[in-house]
Amino acid sequence: MPFSKLGRNKSQRRALLRTLMTDLIVQEKIMITESKAKELQKLADKMVTLSKKNTLHTRRQAKRHLFDEKINDDTTVLQKLFKDISSKYLDRQGGYTRVIKTVPRRGDGAPMAIIAFV
């Protein structure tokens, strides 16, 4: 499956997507460039599919793509993914996120988009 390099090498691209994926789970909606949103959408849909299985193996697979930091005193990012987000989509077979195009960025005119969970 082809993917966008996002103007970065492999390690930088992984770190960027990992940070964006963590932010998306915490905030449930973020505004980023259109190309980053399209790449993040692929990863986010895979993560929700993993979280619906809810086994030890899928938790470890999901942890590879997240920074498992604390959101508040009780919850971590991984717990929010596996408890809150996956429970919303138990009867849904895919298409967990939506990319909405917005106005270009003011400084350089880069096409922007909002990615959010449906």
UniProtKB/Swiss-Prot annotation:
UniProt keywords, alphabetically: Ribonucleoprotein, Ribosomal protein
Cellular component per GO, a single term: large ribosomal subunit
Matches recorded under InterPro entries: Ribosomal_bL17, Ribosomal_bL17_sf
Keyword field contains Repressor: no
GO MF term set: structural constituent of ribosome
Pfam families on file: Ribosomal_L17 (PF01196)
Gene3D superfamilies: Ribosomal protein L17
GO biological process, one term: translation
Protein family (similarity comment): Belongs to the bacterial ribosomal protein bL17 family.
Subunit structure: Part of the 50S ribosomal subunit. Contacts protein L32.
NCBIfam families xref list: L17
Entry-linked HAMAP family: Ribosomal_bL17
PANTHER family per record: LARGE RIBOSOMAL SUBUNIT PROTEIN BL17M, RIBOSOMAL PROTEIN L17
Protein name: Large ribosomal subunit protein bL17
